[in-house]
């Protein structure tokens, strides 16, 4: 997908809370919105080059969203709103091999008491629930999720197990918001419960996908599947 709004580089200064950061742009220090509640501390380092997307909503307090940054010369998109859009585009194009048979794609659908990112279906009546997680944490080519403890994420995985146990298709897709990575693995050091839930999901037959992206400052698209090590 193409990011059609204006893009601008800036120098990262500090992040006083999850939602706000200060950057230097055109020799002026300004406050920007951070559309990611994760830590991103390996990317948002003082002095680092970051990328801003200009927003036009007149009711906003900030003019820009901070959508990514450079780490060792590699651009990483950190916008938490992007993964679902990228995956929806890939589903419609048939670029996720195992899910190509589903031609009905619905966003934000519930099953029981659970709400999942996608409900997929086809003309044969088959159903499949898919949850998407954006991945921004990378170390030496190894990508991990989560970068902060996530009770909500663990709940999603356990709910997918319940769906699968009822005979319905279920999967989680980790969208790695960068390119040229080695593999994906759960971040057990950060969140043991999530990591154990993911292993349990795999054993229960829930599909565990990881895809890296082709990404630059003004575009991002699902590229190729990446090995998952549990």
UniProtKB/Swiss-Prot annotation:
Q: Which Pfam families match?
A: SfsA (PF03749), SfsA_N (PF17746)
Gene Ontology molecular function: DNA binding
- CDD domains, alphabetically? SfsA-like_bacterial
Domain of life, source organism:
Bacteria
What family does this chain come from, according to its entry?
Belongs to the SfsA family.
Xref: HAMAP family: SfsA
Protein name stated in the entry: Sugar fermentation stimulation protein homolog
Q: Which organism is it from?
A: Clostridium tetani (strain Massachusetts / E88)
């Amino acid at each position: 997908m193409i990011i059609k709004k204006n893009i601008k580089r800036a120098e990262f200064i500090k992040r006083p809370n999850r939602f706000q950061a200060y950057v230097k742009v055109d020799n002026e220090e300004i406050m920007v919105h951070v559309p990611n509640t994760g830590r991103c501390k390996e990317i948002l380092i003082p002095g680092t080059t970051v990328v801003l997307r200009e927003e036009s909503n007149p009711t906003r307090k900030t003019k820009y969203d901070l959508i990514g940054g450079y780490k060792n010369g590699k651009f990483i998109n950190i916008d938490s709103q992007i993964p679902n859009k990228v995956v929806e585009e890939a589903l419609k194009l048939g670029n996720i091999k195992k899910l190509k048979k589903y031609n009905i794609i619905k966003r934000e659908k519930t099953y029981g008491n659970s709400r999942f990112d996608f409900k997929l279906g086809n003309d044969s009546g088959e159903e499949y629930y898919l949850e998407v997680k954006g991945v921004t944490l990378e170390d030496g080519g190894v990508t991990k999720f989560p970068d902060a403890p996530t009770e909500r994420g663990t709940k999603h995985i356990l709910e997918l197990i319940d769906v699968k146990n009822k005979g319905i298709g279920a999967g989680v897709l980790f969208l790695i918001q960068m390119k040229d990575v080695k593999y994906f693995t759960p971040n057990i050091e950060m969140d043991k419960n999530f990591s154990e839930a993911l292993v349990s999901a795999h054993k229960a037959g829930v599909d565990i996908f990881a895809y890296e992206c082709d990404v630059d400052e003004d575009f991002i698209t699902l590229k190729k599947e990446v090995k998952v090590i549990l």
